């Protein structure tokens, strides 16, 4: 399956498991995960807040059913939220 079969180029949101999810949510999670694992306290807090906000969408997409977070601290954070 191609990305445009999930969300065409002209569509920015989709319904998945009853949630409206914005295109780019997975990419934003990856960016925030990188920041969280490498950042100072202020950046880390901002990244953690965004990760927590996006978790329902990521779970609705089934992201963690097929991928496992390798960083133990980040995995514990996500599992605890």
Give the predicted meaning of each segment.
Residues 23-46, 56:
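Short, surface-exposed, low-complexity cationic segments
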Residues 55-81:
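Short, compact, well-ordered microdomains
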Residues 1-13:
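Short acidic, Pro/Gly- and aromatic-enriched capping/linker segments at domain boundaries
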